[in-house]
Structures are given as structure tokens and as C-alpha cells.
Amino acid sequence: MRALRFRDVILGVLLVGASAAAPACKKSQPAAPPASMLTPDTPQGFGPRLVWLAFRGASPEAVARGLQLNEPASSTWADGLKAAYQGRVFVTPPLGDAGWVLAASTRFPDPGDKKHPDAATPALVHLSQLFGEVQYFATYDVLDLHAWARFVKGAPVRKLAYLGADSTYVWADGDPTPEENKLGLVFAGKPVGDKGPNEENVFAVAGAWSIDPSTLQTRNLPPSLGVVGSPP
């Protein structure tokens, strides 16, 4: 039996302007209730075993359009995050003073590995052209995969991704940002013993660049609704 790969878990299906692998059969989703019938709930923390994107100042509806989601509909946090872990996409309402909107899923593109191409970079280039800036975060403990990236106006500013299962940095591009330096998260781009980025580091960088989704339940944010949809 071959070893489990990151690509087997987080599928690169959001390829904008690039050819995608043959899609799995899609199950039809039950019709979502209208927003007027939903009761907003309190934001919940998330992050482990997910990929999420961060957009500053965009509306959830604009992000859903940019991600080309199928059948986007209003969703509670509880249902939206459940859907994200089942392969759909949950887009949060604006969070914090800066109005960060996060989009979470297990089916966003991955940075690739020795056997698979980088599916994330083309999508992030396109999304940063649409929105001005997009941030990418991924953490999956089973494979010791931890990644963060920032793209601005179509260009990568910083990309770091470590696949501990292979002791490999699949991304190590751009200089560490001031936030990474302040956190002491400066990695050489090659393994030093078993020292590489971990899940805690991903959340720390997310909190410094935008917002740490694992802390949302502690922020006293008001009840709200997001948007859920299926990836293209």
C-alpha cells in the first residue's frame, strides 16, 4: 500500500486558468434554506486539517464569485464549517476591524510535492489579481504539511510550505516577512533535524498577517451568517 499523500486529502480542484484533473462525481446538494429562515450563530474557531484563504475588505458574495462556487447560499457557522470539512467551501462574513473574509475547505489547491505539480500558485496569482491580495494557509498534521503564502496583485510575496512526511520544503520563496521575523519563524528552506514549521506556526503567521481562525470563538464576535458553496 502506498503512503498517503497530501494531494490525496486536499484535492487541487480550484485551478483558475489551468487544466484540472478529472473531477470526482459530484453529489447533488439539498436546496439551502433562504437567509431569512436561518438563525445567525456565533463564529466558531477552525483551522486544523484545512486550507483557508484570507481576503481583506471583500464581501463574502464577491469571494464566492471569485472562487467560482456552485450554488452559493447563506449558511450558519456550524453548517458551513461542517460543509468545509466535507469538501465544500465556507466563506465567512467580514471579521475584525479590517474586515477579513476567510474561505475554508479541504478541497483548495495544494503546493504539490515531488510527484505532483504546484496547483496552488496559479490560482493564487489569479485571485490576487482579482482582489489585490490573497493569503493562503494550510495545516494537516497527518502528513506534517504546514504552509503559508501571501500574493499581492498577481505576484508572490512570500511562499513557505513544509511537507514533514518527506522532510521537504515544497515552497521556500521570498524573504521572511517582518511579521515572521518578529515571531522568530525564520526557516532556512531546508530541514534541520526534525525542525520545520508546525501547526502552531501557521496559526501564528495567520494572526500576524490577517486573523487566526482558531481564535474566533474567543473574540466576542456577534452572531452572523456566511456563504457555503461547492468548488468548481
Q: What kind of region is each of these model predictions?
A:
Residues 2, 42-45, 127, 140:
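A general structural signal for short secondary-structure junctions and capping/turn motifs
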Residues 20-24:
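C-terminal motif of bacterial Sec signal peptides marking the signal peptidase cleavage site
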Residues 11-15, 19:
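Hydrophobic helical h-region of N-terminal Sec-dependent signal peptides
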